[in-house]
Every structure is written in structure tokens, then in C-alpha cells.
């Protein structure tokens, strides 16, 4: 049986991925310390094996033994908290990613799929193609891009296969809708539930690319399990719909 490990597997994107991996017959191990500024709750699948641990903890090392694929989603995933506590954000997102990669390398994992962010493009005008230079404007985005560089380095230097995804605005089943750091779709849903007007920040000319979590899950599984050319490994790929909507 194929064995997959998902970091952050009890959160929004991770829990959807866990469910689909189990559905297609994978044995799934989850590392999640249930810490998030955005999630009002966490989600569990009875058929998965859960470990309430920090990805930086050496106690997670043995969990990688026998694992085929690692899906690294765990992160401090909001800009606001990263500005309030940049050192912790960099520790989780950069050092934490290095720890995941090192443990995966030591265990002989076949491939690591890394979840990064379109925030790496900063305020550059669309289209946001992968060839654009990084424009990191906050600790969150730069810490995630550091993780990207680590993935490429582990591929080039150590031969650990990695694939890097930059997600745009992910929405769908289990998305956070509460708290000051909820994403924009969650905020809109919360306002609709409370019969409030939708809040538009700025002049209303902002455009965003929204991608359904089902598509993100499918991209992760394909990236992990399909044969890829050597040149495709350690590279960054956008995951979005390709359509810009005014928000």
C-alpha cells in the first residue's frame, strides 16, 4: 500500500487532501499541532493516523520511515500574524520546511510536494507567471519562498525529488470563515450569513485568482505520483484558475 505523510493534514487544504488520499487507497500519516490563526476547527478522518506534533520536532523523524510521498502543507499561513511575529513565522515556514526535507531525505521518501504561495509575486501586475522575479513584501511570503529555495536545493544537491506549488486564493469545503485572518471568501460568507454588506477594501479594482480546493488536491496527488522529467523537479508551478475576479 502506498504510504503518504501530510503535514498540516487537519486544516483546510490538508484535510481535503487526506480524505482524497484515503479514498484512492493510500495509508495516510498526519502531522498537525492544531495551531492556526485562521482555522476555527480542525478535521479528522478515522482512517488516517494523526500525530499532534510540531514539524520542527525531532520526535517526528521516525514518522517518515517507509513513507512514499510527503505533502508539506503545515505553515504559519497568514500575512497578519507574520508581521506580528516574524521570527516564529520564519522558524515555522523556513526551518520547519528544512526539517521536513531532511527527515524525508533520510527516510528515502520518493517525492515531496511543497505548498507555497502566490504572495511571492507581491504587487506585480498580472499575469503572474512563474518566470517573474520574487517580490516578497512581508515575513510570510519571504519565509515561504525560502522554503521553495530549500526544496530546489535538496533536489539539486541531495537528489530528493520535490515539486513546488504556489497557490492563489484557495476556496471550498472547510475554508475558514471566522477570525480576523480569515481569507476573503470566508469573510464574504460570514458577512452574508449575518446579513451584512460585503466589505470592499480600496477602490474595488483589485483582482484575484480563485481556485477550488478540489483542484488543489488533484494537483498535489498528480505531482506526487506521476512520472516527471528531471528538469521538472525542484521547480515552481502556479496553481490557480487562470481567471481574475474583482474583489
Describe the role of every protein-language-model region.
Residues 137, 168-182, 202-214:
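Glycine-rich "substrate-gating" loop/helix at the edge of Rossmann-like oxidoreductase active sites
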